Amino acid sequence: MFEGFESVCLPVGKVGALIASLKQAECDKLALVGQFKRPAFSDISLDKSALALMGRLMLTGDDAALRIVAAYFDEQNIAVVSNAEYLPQQVLPLFYRTQRQFTAGEGDAAKHARTVLDRLGDLDIGQSVIVQQRRVLAIEGAEGTNEMIARTAELIDKSQPDTVFVKMAKSGQDIALDMPVFGVETLSYLEKSGIRTVCLEGEKIMLADPLDVINAAADEAGISICTFASLSEKVDD
């Protein structure tokens, strides 16, 4: 996976070894990649540096925890930088939509979902929500986006329209530390759950796959994707 690159594989909990490796490589910048998951402390062996860091992290929200991690690395003279700095082509454009435009009802549902996420963001909760018309079916918790989508399938009223999945950065979230991610894998979960309408926040979403690949997968699955900036344009009646 990392052929052609200098790499080191370290167990979770060996923070001191990680810092030593970074300094040995004269690294002064760090980009965080991958899903933020909290391991059970009983399953890992912590060194002294990890123990000191864990004391600050206990039972904080994800955004707060990542800020603490970034501050810790900053104390070691290592700056945490945004993935977008190195992968600008993987950032969702401000204006983007697939072939089918949203209906007026889908547009209203997406705007309602955004209001829900805006209010929850101050509490460091959720990057995603699924609504049907004005009814909130699911809010992303510790399980992650795809698992949230999977558990929503049985909650959708198949006799009613306007079920929409929305993903965006939390209000006040530092996207340099944790930019929301969307890709083909999430599209497959949406398709299985019968959700055909997606609204995303342009310039605040990192794409797990090239945009043309996502576009093709969405069209094949019959899923319409639109950014909020494009949503303000004309929708179908």
Q: Predicted regions span which residues?
A:
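Feature captures the catalytic cores and cofactor-binding loops of soluble hydro-lyases/lyases
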Residues: M1-C27, I44-L57, E147-D237
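Conserved mixed alpha/beta catalytic, RNA-binding, or beta-rich assembly cores of soluble enzyme
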Residues: V12, D62-D63, N83-L187
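Short, charged beta->alpha transition segments
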Residues: L18-L22, K37-R38, L66-A71, T115-R119, ...
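Short glycine-enriched loops at secondary-structure junctions
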Residues: Q35-R38, Y86
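Glycine-rich nucleotide phosphate-binding loop and flanking beta-alpha elements
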Residues: K37-P39, L137, G172, I205-M206
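Hydrophobic alpha-helical segments and helix pairs
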Residues: L46-Q101
